[in-house]
Regions:
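Histidine-centered nuclease catalytic patch
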Residues: 1-35, 46-63
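Short, non-transmembrane alpha-helical segments in secretory-pathway proteins
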Residues: 232-260
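Immediate N-terminus of the mature polypeptide
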Residues: 81-231, 256-336
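Intrinsically disordered or highly flexible coil/loop and linker segments, enriched in small
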Residues: 71-78, 208-212, 250
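Amphipathic alpha-helical interaction segments
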Residues: 45-49, 206, 210, 248
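Short, cysteine/histidine-rich loop/knuckle motifs that typically chelate Zn2+
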Residues: 41
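Domain-exit/linker segments immediately C-terminal to small folded modules
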Residues: 52-100
Length: 336
């Protein structure tokens, strides 16, 4: 079944805006609590019959469904876990097999994106940015860059995807000396304390807010505001950590490709004790497989930017980035 996201209360007034509530704030209209995932036929049906499908009826449908198949409480093969293919496709699926020809996964329904996005990625693979040609699998706790365009086959209401991964990026041995300066105290830190601070910084730097590497960064803040209080959040947060631990940074490094998390081989577990922020920080409990150390568990305190900070930071970074590109282009022209 292919899922389509629909609004319980319309996002804006106007012709065809079903169940619009003028008392809702813009944040409430765009919040995950105002969304419901349906099949293509039902999504059209509820938009045509607001008398039969009232706000309360739709909210009760959503509560009943979440109670019956809550992610994390149901480990059945039918439900599966999250799989991301590139930056625009997230689906629920599970691994069918792995061998010399590569791996094969079955996608049961889409959380973000749709079947047309999956097929477009296959046919336009060479036009995709290199850093977006990846696959992430929560079931295994890791991912990697695709070695070529995946093969996609429709199997009833599901899609089966076969792919090969490139050689994994080297990980840094966490037992080797690592030092840094504590952002809070200014004191020198080393070992896992330095790596933990690196994890927190990588997760807290929102994508598109640093002008020097505008395509780098984390999506955790965006995910927090979109999926706050939802059982989907911890799975999507885990997927984001898998991306940061498996996909090399865009930046060029003298020592070769390196991932933002540097020393993490696998992300085995992520828990969200509470969605409440303390000083704009979200506490997360994680279990990683660390190069040189093996299994490691600990807590991370990650800065979460507000929607206003994200918009302002991205606008400022974009201006600086464009100015730098303009200056560099002018310098090249002067040399000709």
């Amino acid at each position: 079944m292919i899922g389509i996201a629909a609004h319980i209360c319309a996002a804006a007034p106007g012709p065809g805006a079903r169940r619009y509530d003028p008392n809702m704030t813009p944040e409430e209209r765009s919040h995950i609590d105002n969304g419901i995932w349906l099949c293509a036929s039902c999504s059209v049906l509820i938009d045509r019959d607001q008398e039969r499908f009232s706000v309360e009826v739709l909210r009760q449908m959503r509560r009943d469904h979440e109670a019956s198949c809550r992610l994390g409480d149901n480990g059945s093969e039918a439900e599966g876990d999250l799989v991301a293919i590139g930056s625009d496709i997230v689906a629920v699926g599970h691994i069918l097999g792995s061998g010399p020809a590569g791996m094969r996964v079955r996608l049961s329904h889409f959380v973000e994106g749709a079947s047309r996005d999956l097929l477009a990625l296959v046919h336009e693979f060479d036009r995709q940015l290199p850093e977006k040609r990846y696959i992430l699998m929560n079931e295994l706790g890791y991912g990697g860059l695709l070695d070529g365009a995946p093969n996609v086959e429709r199997m009833g209401s599901a899609y089966e995807v076969q792919f090969r991964l490139q050689q994994t990026a080297p990980r840094r041995d966490a037992t080797a000396e690592a030092v840094g300066m504590c952002a809070e105290t200014g004191r020198m830190i080393s070992g896992m304390d330095a790596y933990i601070q690196n994890f927190e910084r990588a997760l807290g730097m929102a994508r598109g807010t640093w002008f020097a590497r505008i395509r780098d960064g984390s999506d955790l803040s965006d995910l927090y505001w979109r999926y706050k209080d939802s059982p989907w959040f911890k799975r999507l947060a885990m997927m984001e950590m898998i991306r940061l631990s498996s996909i090399p940074s865009i930046k060029k490094c003298a020592h070769g490709p390196s991932t933002p998390f540097a020393c993490v081989n696998r992300v085995n577990r992520v828990e969200v004790p509470t969605f409440e922020l303390e000083g704009q920080r979200l506490n997360l409990r994680v279990e990683f497989d660390i190069e040189g150390l093996g299994p490691w568990s600990g807590e991370l305190s990650v800065f979460i930017s507000t929607p206003e900070q994200l918009a302002k930071g991205r606008a400022s970074a974009r201006i600086h980035h464009e100015n730098i590109q303009r200056i560099e282009a002018e310098s090249r022209n002067d040399l000709l």
